[in-house]
Amino acid sequence: MERLADFPISICGAGALGANLTETLARCGAKNLTVIDRDRIEEVNLSTQPYELDEVGVMKATSLSRMLYRAVGSEVVAVTKELNERNVRKFLKSAELVVDCFDNSRSRALVTDYCGKNQLDCLHVGMADGFAEVIWNEQYRVPSDRQDDICDYPLARNLVSLAVAVASETVLKFLADGTRENWSITLKDLTITPMVLT
């Protein structure tokens, strides 16, 4: 998809959702990606994020940028600062699509407000215990602080993978024809049926 290669996308958060989504989009051909995250890789991240053991202590955004350059030649811009009221314009001004994958309500509220006020397309991807959402800014409601830390839940890589697959497909459809779909993913209710071959 030619539009994907040049379209400026900023991904907020390089944790389980953001890192895997950035990797998926880069491997699909996205070449104009920025990832914003102030955190360093911790050993606990290795089960759900595409980082390696010898990278513990490295900035997540920096590691992701290096990995994707080595893997597919994608030059992801790594922003290793905390997104806040003073710098949100600076870090999001070049984006035409923002994907919010932050794991806290304060940062999600900042992205929601900024994108709403500036009429900037924004897709929110989030998850909790057995449940994930992919929602465009117009319908999105920032979760309460009680639901903040994704690490409070029994985080499963399979739910991360499903959420990232749905989010990346949502981004690709949006870039192809402007389609804006909202999704909820409930792991418990997911049905996979056997294929009967005759």
What does each model-identified segment do?
Residues M1-T198:
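Adenine nucleotide-associated cytosolic modules
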